[in-house]
Amino acid sequence: MDVVVYGAEKVPPGFRVVKSVEELRRHLRRAFIVVVGDRGLAEELGVAYFSEEEWGDFLRWYAGVYNL
C-alpha cells in the first residue's frame, strides 16, 4: 500500500508527496494517508494526522530504523 503525505516537503524514500487537497482526495481508500499540520483536514477525511513537530520526530525515528 502506498503512503501519501500532504503538508510536508520532506518524506522518507518511497512515500509520495501531494501538493493539493484535490490530489489528496484521489488517493482516499487507495493509500495510507498522512496529513501534516492540518488537523481539521485530517479529521474531515478520516486519515492520520501529525503535527509538524511529530512529523519531524517520525522522520528521525524512520531514518534511524532504516539506516537512512
Region roles according to the model:
Residues 4-10, 35-39:
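Structural motif
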Residues 31-33:
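Conserved nucleotide-sensing/catalytic segment adjacent to the nucleotide-binding pocket
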Residues 6-29, 51-54:
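A short, well-structured beta->alpha microelement
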Residues 2-3, 39-68:
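Ser/Thr/Gly-rich flexible loops in soluble cytosolic domains mediating phosphotransfer, phosphorylation
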